[in-house]
Amino acid sequence: MSGDSNAFGMTQREGTKWDDGCDHDDVTKIYVVGGKYYIQFIKIDYVKSGQPKNGSFHGDSNGGYMLMFEINNLKNEYLESVEGYCNPGRCINAIQFKTNFRVSDMMGYTTGDKFKLASHRKKIIGFQGSADNALKDLDAYFTSITPTRMEAQGGKGGKEWDDGADNDSVTKIQVRINTKGIQYIKLNYVDKDGHPGKEQIHGSETGPGNKLEPFEINHIDKEYLLSIDGYYDEVSGVIKALQFKTNIKTSEVMGDVEKGTKFTLECTGHEIIGFHGFAQDNLNSLGAYITNLPLTKLEYKGCGGNIWDDGTFQGVKKVCVYFNDLIRCIEFEYINGGKEETRVHGMKIFMDDVSKKEFVLDYPNEYLTAVEGTYINPYGYTKITSLTFKTSRNRTSLRMGNASNSSFLLESKGCALVGFHGLSTTDHLYALGAYSFPMTPLPGVKKLDTQAGDGGVPQDDCGSHGV
């Protein structure tokens, strides 16, 4: 059942109770029909034992709008949480779904008490609730998401150790070096309840050596450990050097890389939450446990027009803006599976007083990190008047449009903007929001040491890479 303290659980007395069960692999499709005041019915389709399973209808339809939210399980997408608004004892007024890749529109009307069904690092595999002429309440079944184990890389020898994967994040890493290489690695974690875990040391603390400055990771500020570069000696079987990268910074190279074979632990879209490996007098090899990184929806500020949502992509390649006194049209060129995909919102107006400006990024060596905008608010509707774009290379576009007094900012520290959503009509852009996702710093950006390694975005395959 839901593990969130704000969950709107089985508290209603009215309506017929229903239960889809908890023996599914995943949720695949959700159909919602809404009326003037509340959600009328919901239907959920699942995958069970690898086969599609059609769900039952819960509630009653008396006309109204129908929306469908599809989850692509074949691409490792899964349902993380459900949020919405309700009138306790009566009905659910609005509902919204979030996966590990994207967030649906809010379906319905945002009146009443807010509720949330979520459980940290778990996914939804089933629902239950009650309904008659309306959906009256909703609760969810959760199952844990098993972290992926990346096999240990480095030299041979030593005794096996394993810190496990039952952690929320890595918070501090410190190494001691001697003439052979890494003498020990000291690791600090935060558990799933947010409490500091026991410090773990692997290797030897005896004999001469030099303890280096620790590398600290601020998990409270949404900093995540994303990748590790290591170098080992094939003869001695000892790791010679290590370097760590988060979505915000890169450590100095800890050790000697002059005579070592390189390996990398990383996986696109994942963070490292635990370690295992082999060690005795020195650190011989290092492996990791990884889990999915969080996707954040940066909400738009404003109202008017029609809702649109591009979803998420690998990155943004180009932005084109058409404007005069207002932003008339915005065009995004995204990268999806290595191919370019274009989305246009508004109409490309070619008139004497309409200007066009474009901003091109050097993808995959550069990504979009922030959008600043200004807007006016005539007659209760917002209209965007200017936009400015910033990148991971510390480049800023020219202002596109004419600045006004009210402003907004779409930005999340250490993250790239990988998709957009908003409000528009054929002749105005009313509001703009974005999706943000943690990304590895690129070469030359926020380095702590000029001798840092190759940098760049992580590899596409989830595994260990030897060079």
What are these regions (language model features)?
Residues M1-V467:
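Lectin-type carbohydrate-recognition ectodomains
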